[in-house]
Regions:
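Aromatic-residue-lined binding/catalytic grooves and analogous aromatic/hydrophobic interfacial grooves
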Residues: 2-41, 54
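Structural helix-adjacent loops and short alpha-helical linkers that scaffold large soluble proteins
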Residues: 17-23, 190-198
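Elongated scaffold/linker segments in the mid-to-C-terminal portions of large proteins
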Residues: 27, 33-191
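CBM-like carbohydrate-recognition segments
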Residues: 202
Length: 202
């Protein structure tokens, strides 16, 4: 039901139905909470058990037979599991100009390593005894190439086990945070700029 409200909120926003978009987004939020700063200060975004995920594709280990494990989203986006990304060094990275525009006070800046191959998110990871920023330069033949500057470290591996060859992990389709943004935008565009601003800031 929440996902249906969320879908309608998206549609109403696109159609400039501001009041309906705000109402539907608020309904979609019912029963869900936002991720905290601590929640997003470690690799994650791989589990439908997240309190902010309203709708997700559930992708379990049984759904990833050995000959298909590299073609999952985890095999392409996660920088901590055995897959195309790590074995070939095809890490998803952010442009340095965009990275430098993110304020140092924004926790999301840690979702990528910096030019010195560091991120506070790495402090939460252990790859066969290699921890913290040392993971960046870790190279294992046919398993992991060293990280490049601005590599993404946002997504955790399956069961948070670095080096796993099970590239399962749930795929988020709708989050509570998106609904808050829709609600705030719809309120502001509908003439209640102060209400939308207050909703975002509080």
């Amino acid at each position: 039901r929440n996902a249906a409200y969320g879908m309608r909120a998206r549609a109403n926003l696109v159609m400039n139905n501001w009041g309906e978009a705000a109402t539907d987004a608020e309904a979609a939020l019912s029963g869900y909470t936002f991720l905290s700063k601590d929640d997003v200060s470690a690799p994650g975004f791989n589990s439908a058990n997240s309190p902010s995920w309203i709708w997700a594709g559930i992708y379990k280990a049984a759904d990833t037979p050995a000959n298909y494990r590299n073609i999952t989203w985890g095999g392409h986006l996660c920088s901590f599991a055995r897959g195309y990304t790590t074995s070939q060094g095809l890490y998803k990275r952010i442009n340095s100009l965009l990275y430098n525009m993110i304020p140092d006070t924004d926790v999301r800046k840690g979702w990528w390593i910096n030019a010195s191959l560091e991120s506070p998110l790495l402090d939460h990871m252990d790859w066969d005894g290699v921890t913290g920023s040392a993971i960046s330069s870790l190279a294992i033949p046919n398993v992991k190439r060293a990280f490049q500057p601005y590599t993404n470290v946002k997504f955790a591996p399956y069961e948070n086990k670095c080096g796993t060859d099970i590239n399962a992990g749930d795929w988020c389709i709708m989050r509570a945070e998106e609904m808050l943004l829709i609600q705030a935008e719809a309120m502001a565009m509908g003439g209640n700029l102060g209400g939308g601003k207050s909703l975002l800031e509080n």
